[in-house]
Amino acid sequence: MMAAAKRLEPVYNELRELVRDSYYVMADETPHPVLENDRPGALHRGYMWDFYLPRYHTPFFEYHEGRGESGVDTLIGGKVKVVQSDGFVVYDKFDTLPGRLHLCCWAHVRRKFVEAEGNDPPRARHALDEIEKLYQVERRIKEEKLQGEAIVKLRREISYPIVRELEQWCKREYASTVVNSPIAKAMLYMYTRFEQLAGYVNDAQFRIDNNPVERSIRPLTLNRKNVLFSGSHEAAHAAAIFFSLLGCCRENKINPKEWMEDVLLSLIHISEPTRQE
């Protein structure tokens, strides 16, 4: 596996450059346990970061030993202008940079209010009903096959007022919630991210949520159940290479086995592949 990953690394590096050169990237991260060689039996909690390109239906996985700000350096060091995330604090770094935009995810907001239904049914239901209206607009866009300015126009006319009304509702209602209750947490999660949640209405290519990157990261979750951990940090990096390239195949309906065989057989005959090769 390590030898194959080494041969595939030039392809993986090209994929990284595609991410760095992209305008709009979705981001998420998930734990990836790694065996600690200096402490037999101990596991280090590493992270796989997934940078997903909606334009190309392409995931790119990058292993980091932690979940700190260094995880987003690939994005910050490139030409990426817009990052969409679940609102995890490290992505806030993007908001501080000139000419950059950080979007958040309405699916995560909806999830918070679903969790709060048992705690405060009336208010949780109100929020969920309003969020459903936002998704109805997105379904209409898809059904009517709208493009470009037509998408922006519809979102600004229908979705944006709903977002702002939710903001005002949240501002009014939060004061009467019990601190740290599920409904209070849901409201606070939404209220502190309203600008990042509203931004998707202004560009047709932006998505209402981060669901594509979450779908692309699921195979890693399944892998954790089967493999449990990587044997070293180097092995975790190799896993990131395979997850990235096989994920690209899967997302673009390419047979991963055939693609892998074709590429590895081609690379066998090239001692030091150039960027073009």
Feature-to-residue mapping (PLM):
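Short, Φ-rich (hydrophobic/aromatic) sequence segments
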Residues: 4-19, 125-138, 246
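Short, flexible helix/strand-to-coil boundary loops that buttress conserved ligand/catalytic motifs
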Residues: 95, 117, 201, 274
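Single conserved hydrophobic/aromatic residue that forms the stacking wall/gate
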Residues: 268-277
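Gly/Pro-rich turn-and-neighbor structural signature
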Residues: 1-74, 78, 142-201, 205
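Helix-rich, typically C-terminal accessory recognition domains appended to large enzymatic cores
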Residues: 169-216, 220-226, 232-263
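A short structural micro-motif
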Residues: 3, 266-267
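A conserved active-site cap/scaffold subdomain adjacent to cofactor or substrate pockets
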Residues: 110-145
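Acidic, glycine-rich two-metal-ion catalytic cores of nucleic acid-processing enzymes
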Residues: 10-13, 17-107, 111, 215-230, ...
